[in-house]
């Protein structure tokens, strides 16, 4: 792997073209330049095979399916507009998601970058993963999120959260535009 130095404007442009969490700069540039992206870099890790256990099949199906929650109606537009900056709006929306279904929120802990931790249950966990994480608590949820990402990355992270909640694409776009 070779390293190159790029100016801030170019870095922001590349970062804004991120399509999924964990996508490397090389993958972004390869995609933008129309070059072949290495298969190993884009493929998800294989999940372990689920072994059927009599009497538990129905429970497993229920847990795997995200429960649809209409988050659009649970976000107070006036309070969102009053939130300070992109970080404030990001935290406000995450708190609204949490309040809509607190028992389902733990799944955000699965959202991670290639070398980055985005959510944790303590400030220390995020700081241990990255000294520059600038962790903030999501309301009074007991969950913490890294906030030193650019706005495009915050939107990508929020998109992943909303996907986990079974939110439809049109709502995801509408909600993430508010950051």
From Swiss-Prot:
It comes from the Bacteria. Its main location: cytoplasm. InterPro entries: Arc_rbn_hlx_hlx, Ribbon_hlx_hlx, SeqA, SeqA_DNA-bd_C, SeqA_DNA-bd_C_sf, SeqA_N. It is found in: Cytoplasm. One of its GO terms (biological process) is negative regulation of DNA-templated DNA replication initiation. Keywords: Cytoplasm, DNA replication inhibitor, DNA-binding. GO terms for molecular function: DNA binding. Disulfide bonds: none annotated. GO terms for cellular component: cytoplasm. Residues 86-87 are annotated as: Interaction with DNA. The keyword Transit peptide does not apply. Negative regulator of replication initiation, which contributes to regulation of DNA replication and ensures that replication initiation occurs exactly once per chromosome per cell cycle. Binds to pairs of hemimethylated GATC sequences in the oriC region, thus preventing assembly of replication proteins and re-initiation at newly replicated origins. Repression is relieved when the region becomes fully methylated. Belongs to the SeqA family. Homodimer. Polymerizes to form helical filaments. This is Negative modulator of initiation of replication. It comes from Shewanella woodyi (strain ATCC 51908 / MS32).
């Amino acid at each position: 792997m070779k390293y190159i130095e790029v100016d801030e404007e170019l870095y922001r442009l590349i970062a804004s073209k991120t399509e999924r969490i964990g996508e490397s700069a090389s993958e972004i540039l390869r995609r933008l330049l129309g070059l072949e992206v290495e298969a190993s870099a884009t493929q998800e890790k294989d999940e372990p095979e689920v072994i059927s256990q009599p009497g538990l099949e129905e429970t497993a199906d229920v847990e795997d399916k995200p429960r649809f929650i209409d988050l659009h109606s649970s976000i107070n537009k006036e309070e969102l507009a009053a939130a300070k900056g992109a970080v404030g709006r990001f935290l406000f929306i995450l708190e609204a998601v949490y309040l809509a279904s607190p028992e389902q929120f733990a799944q955000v802990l699965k959202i991670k970058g290639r070398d980055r931790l985005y959510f944790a249950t303590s400030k220390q966990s995020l700081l241990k993963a990255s000294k520059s994480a600038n962790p903030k608590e999501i309301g009074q949820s007991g969950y913490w999120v890294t906030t030193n990402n650019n706005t495009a990355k915050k939107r990508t992270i929020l998109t992943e959260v909303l996907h986990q909640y079974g939110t439809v694409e049109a709502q995801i776009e509408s909600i993430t535009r508010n950051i």
